[in-house]
């Protein structure tokens, strides 16, 4: 049984599978950290700062919604910490895992469909390669 589990989410439809896995392996007095990494768009010569801020605000709002939706799938007696951070997903996931002292990262084998599926699959691969803690890979059905 694991006492502190990091559960990253990208808002994909596989959350139920991941949550069920966590429920089965979380210690009775354990904690789950539900994390979403909001991308960060930087301004360029082609985009106004106002537009960039608007996009970044939407990315953060979406990430918060993903975290809230996944956290709501746990029973009230489970300690759930919700986090939204900015950065590159694989780096941010491993950084949070190290900083928060988690025992396990539970992550989906793929994320959203289309191009996102390819990109998030590579995020999973980088987390697996660079993690300093155990990683449970949930194959999507």
What are these regions (language model features)?
Residues 3-51:
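Small/aliphatic-rich secondary-structure junction motif
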Residues 20, 68, 72, 125:
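Active-site phosphate/pyrophosphate- and oxyanion-stabilizing loops and adjacent acidic/basic residues
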Residues 26-27, 75, 132:
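Short conserved AdoMet
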Residues 33-35, 81-85, 136:
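General small-molecule cofactor/ligand-binding pocket signal
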Residues 52-65:
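A short acidic, glycine-rich active-site loop
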Residues 72-105:
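Structural beta-alpha unit
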Residues 98-141:
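Gly/Ser-rich helix-loop-strand patches that form or flank binding pockets
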């Amino acid at each position: 049984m694991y006492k502190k589990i990091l559960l990253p989410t990208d808002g994909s439809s596989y959350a139920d599978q991941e949550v069920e896995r966590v429920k089965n392996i979380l210690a009775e007095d354990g904690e789950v950290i539900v994390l979403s990494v909001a991308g960060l768009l930087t301004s360029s010569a082609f985009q106004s700062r106002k537009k960039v801020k608007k996009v970044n605000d939407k990315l953060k709002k979406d990430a918060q919604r993903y975290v809230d939706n996944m956290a709501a799938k746990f029973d009230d007696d489970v300690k759930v910490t919700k986090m939204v951070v900015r950065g590159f997903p694989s780096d941010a996931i491993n950084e949070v895992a190290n900083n928060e002292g988690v025992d396990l990262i539970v992550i989906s084998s793929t994320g959203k469909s289309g191009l996102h599926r390819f990109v998030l699959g590579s995020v999973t691969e980088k987390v697996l390669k660079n993690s300093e803690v155990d990683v449970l890979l949930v194959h999507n059905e």
